[in-house]
């Protein structure tokens, strides 16, 4: 995300995989980023109290960001092309516009790249919880999905617009709580390229689908602790 994003807050909770140490070291090196430790475990299913709800954790972290500032919400299992991300900050023309980012869920198995078969044959077009917005909105609310409790942001009186191109790689299995999951409905990279040939060069730069580059991005995660 550097140097596109030069300041912000990094929320974390209940880390036992070395993430806390990485975050603290990063914030020490780049003091314009503030580490925010949430004092409760976040539980997606059968939460004992609201303090353990994911949306409450999001609101706690968001509370450290000043109102009336532009905010982008990102997750730890995304790796960004900084130039593309920076360009996307110029998409909104008013504080009433919200940029919805697209993504592909990449899965690496035995050094081979696949896409999870989500959305339109692996392409999630301006979908999900990945936004650029002006922070004059209401707090996060709970969102129930498949029995789990997540977060949603009610962006009232806002106009949603799509990103212009894919700006990041999303590796959902890089999160520790997901690394035991097995996905059977996977799309080989070559099949994705063939199916979405119309998107390559328009919504997706070809280099974003280069297998060697994707594997290099994936190897940036410290998976040895897993």
Model-predicted segments: where are they?
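Gly/Ala-rich phosphate-binding loop of Rossmann-like dinucleotide-binding domains
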Residues: 2
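Short coil/turn segments at beta-strand junctions that form active-site/ligand-binding loops
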Residues: 6, 67-70, 95
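Short beta-strand/loop segment that forms part of the nucleotide-sugar
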Residues: 6-17, 38
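Residues that form or flank phosphate/diphosphate-binding pockets in enzymes
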Residues: 17-18, 80
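Active-site-proximal specificity loops/subdomain of glycosyltransferases
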Residues: 18-70
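Catalytic-site signature of metal-activated, phosphate-bearing donor transferases
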Residues: 48-59, 79-226
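Short beta-strand-to-loop acidic/aromatic patch adjacent to the donor-nucleotide binding site
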Residues: 68-81
């Amino acid at each position: 995300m550097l140097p596109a994003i030069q300041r912000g807050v990094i929320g974390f909770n209940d880390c036992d995989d070395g993430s806390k140490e990485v975050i603290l070291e990063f914030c020490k090196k780049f003091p314009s980023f503030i580490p925010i430790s949430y004092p409760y475990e976040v539980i997606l299913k059968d939460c004992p109290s609201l303090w353990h709800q994911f949306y409450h954790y999001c609101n706690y972290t968001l509370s450290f960001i000043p109102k009336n500032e532009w905010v982008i919400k990102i997750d730890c299992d995304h790796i960004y092309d900084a130039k593309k991300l920076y360009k996307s900050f110029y998409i909104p023309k008013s504080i009433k516009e919200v940029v919805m980012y697209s993504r592909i869920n990449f899965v690496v198995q035995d050094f081979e790249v696949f896409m999870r078969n989500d959305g339109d044959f692996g392409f999630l077009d301006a979908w999900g919880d990945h936004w650029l917005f002006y922070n004059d909105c209401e707090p996060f609310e709970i969102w129930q999905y498949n029995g789990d409790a997540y977060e949603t942001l009610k962006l009232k009186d806002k106009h949603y617009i799509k990103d212009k191109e894919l700006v990041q790689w999303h590796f959902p299995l890089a999160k520790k709580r997901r690394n035991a999951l097995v996905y059977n409905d996977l799309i080989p990279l070559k099949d994705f390229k063939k199916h979405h040939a119309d998107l390559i060069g328009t919504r997706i730069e070809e280099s974003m689908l280069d297998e060697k580059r994707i594997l290099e991005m994936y190897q940036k995660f410290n998976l040895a602790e897993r």
